[in-house]
Regions:
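Positively charged n-region of N-terminal signal peptides that target proteins for export
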Residues: 1-4
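Bacterial N-terminal signal peptides
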Residues: 6-15
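Sec/Tat signal peptide C-region and signal peptidase I cleavage site
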Residues: 16-20
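Amphipathic alpha-helical scaffolding segments comprising HEAT/armadillo-like alpha-solenoid repeats
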Residues: 22-37, 59-71, 93-111, 121, ...
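Mature N-terminal segment immediately following signal peptide/propeptide cleavage
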Residues: 28-56
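Structural signature of alpha-solenoid helical repeat scaffolds
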Residues: 42, 75, 95, 111-115, ...
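Residue-level detector of extended alpha-helical repeat arrays and alpha-solenoid scaffolds
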Residues: 43-47, 62, 76-81, 120, ...
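Core register positions within helices of long alpha-helical scaffolds
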Residues: 53-56, 83-90, 97, 123-129, ...
C-alpha cells in the first residue's frame, strides 16, 4: 500500500517538476541561433519578442552575433545585421537603460574584435545609435583610421 501511495504521489508531482523547467534557461548561443532562424518575424509583436530575447543575452549575445559577420566577399551579413540593428533599436526605448549599457559594451568589444573594416564600420554605426558620452574614447580610437574615420567622427558628433 505504501509503494502505491508513493508511486501515485510521485506521478502527481511530475507535472510540477516539468513546469519548473522554463525555456528561458537556454544559453545565449541557443537564444541567438533561435532568433536568427526566426527572422524576419511574421508580425511586429513576434519581432519585439525576439528582440527582447536577444537584448536579454546582453554583451555576450552582441559579441556572438558580431562574430558571425563575414567579409562581403565571403557571405551575406543581412540577417545578422538585421538582428543587431533590431536589438539596438529595442534597447534605445525609454526604460531599457540597463539593457542598452550591456549592448554598448558588447558593441564596443565587437568593434575591437572585428578585423573586417566594413563590419567594423557597421558596428560603430550601431554603437552610435545607443552611445553615451562614455563611448567617446571608442570613436577617438578609430578617428584617425582611413576607412573608419568618417563613421568614427559621426559617432563623436552625434547627439
Amino acid at each position: 500500500m505504501k509503494k502505491i501511495f508513493i508511486t501515485i504521489l510521485l506521478a502527481a508531482l511530475m507535472p510540477f517538476a516539468a513546469g519548473a523547467q522554463d525555456a528561458r534557461q537556454r544559453t545565449a548561443e541557443t537564444i541567438v541561433a533561435d532568433a536568427l532562424a526566426q527572422l524576419p518575424a511574421q508580425t511586429p509583436k513576434a519581432f519585439a519578442s525576439l528582440m527582447q530575447e536577444l537584448a536579454a543575452t546582453g554583451a555576450d549575445g552582441i559579441r556572438m552575433m558580431a562574430a558571425m559577420l563575414v567579409p562581403a566577399a565571403e557571405g551575406k551579413n543581412a540577417p545578422v545585421e538585421y538582428a543587431i540593428n533590431g536589438v539596438v533599436s529595442y534597447v534605445t526605448a525609454a526604460g531599457r537603460e540597463e539593457l542598452a549599457r550591456e549592448i554598448r559594451a558588447g558593441l564596443t568589444d565587437a568593434v575591437a574584435a572585428s578585423t573586417d573594416k566594413p563590419n567594423q564600420a557597421f558596428l560603430l554605426s550601431q554603437l552610435q545609435l545607443c552611445a553615451t558620452a562614455a563611448e567617446a574614447p571608442v570613436y577617438v580610437t578609430y578617428a584617425a583610421h582611413e576607412y573608419l574615420a568618417d563613421t568614427a567622427v559621426r559617432g563623436l558628433i552625434a547627439p
